[in-house]
Amino acid sequence: MVKVSITKDLYKLAAAHKYASMLAEYLSNGTKYWCFGSHGGFERNYQAMAANIRKIHLKLPGERPWPPEFTSSQRTCDNFLVYAQHYYDDEHFQILAIISPDAHQLSDVMLPRIITLAETSFIELSPDELASLKTYDA
């Protein structure tokens, strides 16, 4: 069962909780949501790839959704939902950042901090520490 938690920095952001619930469904069974677009990693950054950090293009509330005929790879924008997959529990993910606007430009600058956040507060947590996190399951 896929579980998605939220980093402490975003915990008070209501939208992050909604995205966590939707991300769990998306990763678990491929449920499509109006706000989720193209999905991938930060392939040009070895440290981000090594830390299991990924991104999904994200439409924000109030933005017009992509046309329904667009494929996932056509659903691109300049906002990212950034998350990591745990090293040992491959069904547990954590939302680390929402980068908006100018995600393509800012992500290179923000990645070192996001990598450190993933490494120090999520990707190597023990099973007991993971169990203590509030999660959205699917």
Q: Where are the regions that the model predicts?
A:
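Basic, Lys/Arg-enriched alpha-helical interface segments
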Residues: 1-78, 87-138
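Hydrophobic/aromatic beta-strand elements that line small-molecule binding cavities or substrate pockets
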Residues: 81-82
